[in-house]
């Protein structure tokens, strides 16, 4: 009797996995394509970079930031200085102080007329993040998900049934 119940539960679990794997992604065919804006050499940041790069043809352009605080301050300063566009790509965005602070700065930039594009990995993005939902409502902001799960509410099932597809990284 116990082995029959275990078999029935296993069969029910297998059925749920198969049915969950049959779910398709949402239709995005009507969504407007988004492209980067032309080179921003005419902006204050662009001119500053050009001055720093003068005579540095072999420089990589990377400047390591050794602490999280340094990285956050640098991002916030860049957002404040942006004149035309901001393109962000994140694997993880949380509703913590850092996420809310960055969202507030991005909203301020969008209010100034700066186009803000945010690309998030769906695996590292919380469900129903109010700050991201609020940002996405702004006409100058686009929030997009990379590799969206077919069912965001049942992430566990999507990871089990579509692991090879949803486990890719940006």
Tell me what each language-model feature is.
Residues 22, 39-46, 50-82, 92-170:
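HKD-type phospholipase D/PLD-like phosphodiesterase module
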Residues 1-11:
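Bacterial N-terminal signal peptides that target proteins for export
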Residues 17-39:
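Bacterial Sec signal peptide processing site at the extreme N-terminus
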Residues 86:
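Phosphate/adenylate-binding glycine loop and adjacent helical scaffold
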Residues 9-19:
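Gram-negative bacterial Sec-dependent N-terminal signal peptides
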Residues 2-3, 17, 69, 83:
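A general, composition-driven signal for non-globular sequence regions
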